[in-house]
Amino acid sequence: MIKKYEACFLFKSEELEYKVALEDVKKQLTAFNASDFVENSLGERALEYSIRKQSRGRYEIIEFKMDSSNLKELEVQLRLIKNLLRYMILVKINKKVNVKKVKRRNFREFKDNRDTREKELPESTADVKVD
Protein backbone atom coordinates (compact mmCIF):
# COMPACT_ATOMS: atom_id res chain seq x y z
CA MET A 1 0.00 0.00 0.00
CA ILE A 2 1.43 3.36 -1.01
CA LYS A 3 1.60 5.87 1.83
CA LYS A 4 2.88 9.40 2.16
CA TYR A 5 5.92 9.77 4.43
CA GLU A 6 7.82 12.66 5.93
CA ALA A 7 11.45 12.02 6.83
CA CYS A 8 13.83 14.21 8.80
CA PHE A 9 17.53 13.59 8.24
CA LEU A 10 20.46 14.90 10.28
CA PHE A 11 23.77 15.03 8.40
CA LYS A 12 27.30 16.03 9.35
CA SER A 13 27.77 19.77 8.97
CA GLU A 14 30.72 19.75 6.54
CA GLU A 15 29.52 20.86 3.11
CA LEU A 16 31.07 18.08 1.03
CA GLU A 17 30.04 15.29 3.41
CA TYR A 18 26.53 16.73 3.60
CA LYS A 19 26.07 16.81 -0.18
CA VAL A 20 27.43 13.28 -0.66
CA ALA A 21 25.21 11.85 2.08
CA LEU A 22 22.14 13.70 0.78
CA GLU A 23 22.71 12.26 -2.69
CA ASP A 24 23.08 8.78 -1.15
CA VAL A 25 19.75 9.21 0.64
CA LYS A 26 18.05 10.31 -2.58
CA LYS A 27 19.53 7.33 -4.44
CA GLN A 28 18.21 4.96 -1.79
CA LEU A 29 14.76 6.53 -1.94
CA THR A 30 14.60 6.19 -5.72
CA ALA A 31 15.94 2.62 -5.49
CA PHE A 32 12.94 1.73 -3.31
CA ASN A 33 10.51 3.38 -5.77
CA ALA A 34 9.78 6.49 -3.73
CA SER A 35 8.11 9.27 -5.70
CA ASP A 36 6.77 12.84 -5.37
CA PHE A 37 9.77 14.29 -3.53
CA VAL A 38 9.37 17.58 -1.67
CA GLU A 39 12.61 18.78 -0.07
CA ASN A 40 12.97 21.37 2.65
CA SER A 41 16.35 22.27 4.10
CA LEU A 42 16.41 23.60 7.65
CA GLY A 43 20.11 24.43 7.45
CA GLU A 44 22.91 23.97 9.91
CA ARG A 45 22.16 24.05 13.62
CA ALA A 46 23.93 23.38 16.88
CA LEU A 47 23.11 20.03 18.45
CA GLU A 48 21.93 19.79 22.04
CA TYR A 49 24.42 16.99 22.64
CA SER A 50 27.22 15.63 20.49
CA ILE A 51 26.46 12.75 18.12
CA ARG A 52 29.49 10.82 16.84
CA LYS A 53 31.73 13.67 18.05
CA GLN A 54 29.73 16.24 16.04
CA SER A 55 28.41 19.36 17.77
CA ARG A 56 26.66 20.79 14.67
CA GLY A 57 24.51 19.20 12.00
CA ARG A 58 22.45 19.94 8.90
CA TYR A 59 18.76 19.11 8.87
CA GLU A 60 16.86 18.10 5.76
CA ILE A 61 13.16 17.22 5.55
CA ILE A 62 11.95 15.16 2.59
CA GLU A 63 8.32 14.24 1.91
CA PHE A 64 7.73 11.30 -0.42
CA LYS A 65 5.32 8.53 -1.39
CA MET A 66 6.41 4.92 -1.15
CA ASP A 67 5.06 1.41 -0.77
CA SER A 68 4.93 0.54 2.93
CA SER A 69 6.42 -2.91 2.33
CA ASN A 70 9.73 -1.29 1.30
CA LEU A 71 10.14 0.73 4.49
CA LYS A 72 12.11 -1.84 6.52
CA GLU A 73 14.61 -2.40 3.70
CA LEU A 74 14.98 1.36 3.26
CA GLU A 75 15.81 1.80 6.95
CA VAL A 76 18.46 -0.91 6.73
CA GLN A 77 20.11 0.88 3.81
CA LEU A 78 19.90 4.29 5.54
CA ARG A 79 21.84 2.92 8.52
CA LEU A 80 24.74 2.15 6.19
CA ILE A 81 25.19 5.78 5.06
CA LYS A 82 28.29 6.99 6.89
CA ASN A 83 27.63 10.75 7.16
CA LEU A 84 23.97 10.40 8.13
CA LEU A 85 23.88 10.98 11.90
CA ARG A 86 20.17 10.41 12.57
CA TYR A 87 16.92 9.97 10.67
CA MET A 88 13.25 9.75 11.52
CA ILE A 89 10.53 8.60 9.11
CA LEU A 90 6.91 9.40 9.92
CA VAL A 91 3.68 8.47 8.16
CA LYS A 92 1.98 11.65 7.03
CA ILE A 93 -1.74 11.56 7.82
CA ASN A 94 -4.04 13.96 6.03
CA LYS A 95 -7.12 13.48 8.19
CA LYS A 96 -8.93 16.52 9.48
CA VAL A 97 -9.12 16.55 13.23
CA ASN A 98 -12.07 18.04 15.06
CA VAL A 99 -10.70 20.22 17.79
CA LYS A 100 -12.96 21.02 20.69
CA LYS A 101 -12.53 24.54 21.93
CA VAL A 102 -11.44 24.52 25.55
CA LYS A 103 -12.47 27.25 27.92
CA ARG A 104 -9.45 29.12 29.19
CA ARG A 105 -8.94 29.39 32.89
CA ASN A 106 -9.25 32.84 34.30
CA PHE A 107 -6.02 33.32 36.19
CA ARG A 108 -7.19 36.61 37.67
CA GLU A 109 -9.86 34.77 39.64
CA PHE A 110 -7.27 32.31 40.88
CA LYS A 111 -4.95 35.14 41.90
CA ASP A 112 -7.78 36.96 43.70
CA ASN A 113 -8.67 33.81 45.64
CA ARG A 114 -5.06 33.33 46.64
CA ASP A 115 -4.84 36.94 47.86
CA THR A 116 -7.85 36.49 50.14
CA ARG A 117 -6.38 33.29 51.61
CA GLU A 118 -3.11 35.06 52.33
CA LYS A 119 -4.96 37.83 54.15
CA GLU A 120 -6.79 35.30 56.33
CA LEU A 121 -3.61 33.52 57.44
CA PRO A 122 -1.99 36.41 59.34
CA GLU A 123 -5.23 37.17 61.21
CA SER A 124 -5.52 33.60 62.48
CA THR A 125 -1.89 33.58 63.65
CA ALA A 126 -2.32 36.92 65.42
CA ASP A 127 -4.54 35.29 68.05
CA VAL A 128 -1.77 32.94 69.16
CA LYS A 129 0.81 34.50 71.47
CA VAL A 130 4.33 33.19 71.48
CA ASP A 131 6.35 33.50 74.73
Curated annotation (Swiss-Prot):
Q: Which GO terms describe its cellular component?
A: ribonucleoprotein complex; ribosome
Similarity comment: Belongs to the bacterial ribosomal protein bS6 family.
Which Gene3D superfamilies does the protein's record reference? 3.30.70.60
Described purpose of this protein according to its UniProt entry: Binds together with bS18 to 16S ribosomal RNA.
Alphabetical list of SUPFAM superfamilies matching this protein: Ribosomal protein S6
Molecular function (GO) terms listed?
rRNA binding; structural constituent of ribosome
> Pfam families annotated for this entry?
Ribosomal_S6
Q: Which GO terms describe its biological process?
A: translation
Keywords on record: Ribonucleoprotein, Ribosomal protein, RNA-binding, rRNA-binding
**Record-given protein name:** Small ribosomal subunit protein bS6
Q: Does the keyword rRNA-binding apply?
A: yes
Q: Which domain of life is it from?
A: Bacteria
Q: Which organism is it from?
A: Borrelia hermsii (strain HS1 / DAH)
